[in-house]
Design a protein with these regions (language model features):
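Phosphate/NTP-binding elements of NTP-utilizing enzymes
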Residues: 1-99
Length: 99
């Protein structure tokens, strides 16, 4: 599964959300196999193959694909509808949540 956390202005809030996700995986006994943290590209991969990244939601966020997305509530509806929602691809499980 691939997940993306989309944020508007606060990278720190998006990283807090990623830390929540990391804790959930730790409770399921999945270890981290790759961890890359930078302001422009934060990526984490777990031992079960799941992949999470943090992306800023703007006009340049096109071209990504994921099965699940966490979307910051402050992001404009037009960006959500035209840019973020098309990135969510159907698999056996698909979803999005606002945080």
């Amino acid at each position: 599964m691939k997940g993306i956390i989309f944020y508007k202005n606060s990278y720190e809030k998006a990283f807090e959300k990623l830390e929540e996700i990391i804790n959930n995986y730790k409770e399921l006994n999945y270890s981290i196999t790759q961890y890359k943290k930078s302001r422009l590209d934060t990526v984490i991969t777990f031992s079960n193959g799941d992949y999470w990244q943090i992306k800023k939601a703007n006009e340049h966020s096109r071209g990504f694909a994921c099965n699940i997305a966490y979307i910051e509530r402050e992001i404009e509806k037009a960006i959500v509808d035209t840019i973020i929602m098309p990135t969510i691809k159907a698999k056996t499980y698909t979803g999005f949540n606002f945080w």
